Amino acid sequence: MHIFITGIAGFIGANAAEQLLKAGHRVTGIDNLNDYYDPQLKQARLAPLNKNPNFRFHHAAIEDPDVLKNLFEANSFDAVIHLAAQAGVRYSIENPRSYLNSNLIGTFELLEAARAHPPKHMLLASTSSAYGANEAMPYQETQRADHQMSFYAATKKSTEAMAHSYAHLYQLPITMFRFFTVYGPWGRPDMALFKFTDAILNDRPIDVYNHGNMRRDFTYVDDLVQALILLIETPPSDTPVTTEDSLSPVAPHRVLNIGNNAPVALEEFIAAIETATGRSATRNLMDMQAGDVPATWADTSLLQALTGYQPKTDIQTGVRKFVDWYNSYYS
């Protein structure tokens, strides 16, 4: 298959491309390589991909309609994995305009390009933040998700609605996946695992929000990528697979959680980092950050029914692999 990935130089995009290339697929990717975090880290993720003859990289922004139009005209993509986005709940409070451009306009331009040259399946990234103030645990795809707590979450929930309209109007098979706190080697510097590891190894205190009373459904990146690969060949059909299927009644459109189905307390997460680094953390206990939620928990039963997906990586193993990568990369 020929697969198009947006946000190819990102943490998830580069990992997905690596696994797809290993499986013998062709991959074309696009990324604007912006400076939200260190562009050299993005270039380092791309370096091994660029050595593969089945890989093509385009340095451009998805908000540019001509770029996507030309790419879709010149290629026949079997599947699209849309990962390009301005990420980060906290950053969106101070820089909302960048989320408007990348998340909303960029997704619109991608949907327009796909409308003219339809792939067999589009997989578009949403987020667990789309569940907003919902306190019913675990999060299930058929639950109401109406009260987003940050502009980032609002833009991602909006892309779900945009995608549904295109699926209905143009019969584009679209799966929206809400992923839950993805972590692992090559992770983003703005994420807790990277920030905590960097601080602990450099004898700085870590900021612990809500005084540590937080739980997250941490999802190891290899598990997430395996779910995406399984989903590529599972586009929405006319028939629900469970009684709680989020399949739209009027469009080939489905929303799916991708998580670990096992929330981890923040203190357990920090303890895993302390064990992996061999050092103790100095905690700076703080109030809850605006736009954040105290807990997330993915119900993955629909994903399991569709693909047989089973996450394989526990938090201790995943954190250790990240710390090993961090020490190697920054040595």
How should these model regions be labeled?
Residues 137-138, 189-197:
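A glycine/serine/threonine-rich, flexible loop-to-helix segment
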Residues 15, 40-44, 70, 91-94, ...:
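Generic recognition of short, well-ordered alpha-helical segments
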Residues 63, 87, 187, 264-265, ...:
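Short alpha-helical
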